[in-house]
């Protein structure tokens, strides 16, 4: 099985968000995919399997399978359109979040994702304790999004991972207005065994719509201000969908040699009356019953080379 390491939302290796992309020839068990994702220890490992005219796509963090992942989808598109479907400029994925289409446009890959509904919720002391700074606004959808006044607060932030676990949402994202872009953000997913996602595409299904409404723009340039950093170009399409674009860079190609473990041998449960000695007696009786006809036939047959009178 081929595995590709791709950095998403960047045009150069060792930046953006790394993802492992496995191109499979047959279905793998959930257990095997989870073990390999844990071994890779990236925020996401993607698994691709040809299905009809498209590809079945599943995403695993080191801790669990997830319903949607932006950067691993972008990475998967990069792999397929550069190494498996070079003649095409678009690829279709069948996922737990429905059918997703990604189109290659120049050097970028544009993903068509659903906008994630969200509502404003009260800012709490627990949020302030977790982030070390009090947000000016909070929104809750699949993730908790906390808005801050200054992008430097986002860059310097060192959240308490234990306290983040107690907040609502699958993960927690923080965002603020940007100086050289429309917004900066960071995303944390300790509940999924991902302390910080370097560049999170799916989080911008909430972040970008918020800033589009706040600024009156339909196109949002977002920068994820993690240590690795990455750029996302988001466009609200007005139909409950959002286009999220970015670049990608190949880092490595490898062969996965580990195989699925064989299914465990089912052992017959011993009943209360099981006794090894009794079992041995039964086996002896069975052997005697099978060999008895053969013994009698040998005794009854005349022996060659012996005269009889």
Task: List each model region and its residues.
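Active-site proximal loop and beta-alpha junction motif in alpha/beta enzyme cores
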Residues: 1-68, 74-262
